């Protein structure tokens, strides 16, 4: 390090290394120097960080109205109109409640009306957009979002995950900013798999069913939970992260296979013998919209768990038209995604209308919903995606109905030969 008494040629900025002659001014500190250029650069960095922090703070107070939330969901999620409306209202009311609680002073809190939290239960078949709806909501609201699988959870003290590990995922999604995590969204999937195995309470302990429901009660309602920072089981010599779940929105979802029979029996819509009314699978799925708490209790959810999920909404099985729309219409439609991938190799990808219909029909036949569309696209395009990057002659790939249904190769259109090559 250069000293003050040395020649000016030896004095250099400790950050960029420029000499005193190369800069306008060199500021001396205790054993270090900084030039005017580095000072200006540091000021720019600080201003950018402050601006980013301001944007984050302002985004936290940007609460869209239900119609705006619905409109955003419309851009990305096809169908499920009733579910989108219910979710838009429920999410708006939840965060309106959060803002109201944050604005109340300690003195006003005594006399103010306390609004209870309204968690959401989503019921519907697999591949119909339950998880995607929740993910899209979180992205619009700019809040931390975590997905958990209820089947991995067990009651405390047994092999498996504790319910507190769900909260750890949310904290990790918020980059360990606990305050931000406390206003996030947790999506718990496969909640129907933790239903009690029998309608009557069992003598033996149901550690992955009723036991998990009991363990979830407190965090659903709102409590200060102790979360192990590295996950896993708690032990006494470990530091814990304290998180308040009062303002965390829980969206729990499941397929609830067999629930339609319970609803139908309760409503008297099932009969036996030759006089029994005929009904289709579509009628069964529409029965979900008539679900009552007593049906969920008979399915295997305990009353206390049902009571903490006051907003119940359903999604319906996607038909061919809806799957066709999912393939082509949303901003991140599956067809557009694959077209973009081919574009990166300089190749244009096209689909015949009949090919898209065949893909949608296959997804309906396999009963995999929207989730199965990508698997079918991979089956159809996999071989050609292997060949295209190695060939410079391919200009266009056209996917036909035969390529989908008969494993035929998609049509390959080569580049047009240049005029010089023609004249030769």
UniProtKB/Swiss-Prot annotation:
Keywords: ATP-binding, Chaperone, Metal-binding, Nucleotide-binding, Zinc. Residues 1-54 form the ClpX-type ZB domain. GO terms for biological process: cell division; proteolysis involved in protein catabolic process. It comes from the Bacteria. PROSITE patterns: CLPX_ZB. Zn(2+) binds at residues 13, 16, 35, 38. ATP binds at residues 125-132. GO terms for cellular component: HslUV protease complex. GO terms for molecular function: ATP binding; ATP hydrolysis activity; ATP-dependent protein folding chaperone; protein dimerization activity; unfolded protein binding; zinc ion binding. It holds the Pfam family ClpB_D2-small. Belongs to the ClpX chaperone family. Component of the ClpX-ClpP complex. Forms a hexameric ring that, in the presence of ATP, binds to fourteen ClpP subunits assembled into a disk-like structure with a central cavity, resembling the structure of eukaryotic proteasomes. ATP-dependent specificity component of the Clp protease. It directs the protease to specific substrates. Can perform chaperone functions in the absence of ClpP. This is ATP-dependent Clp protease ATP-binding subunit ClpX. It comes from Leifsonia xyli subsp. xyli (strain CTCB07).
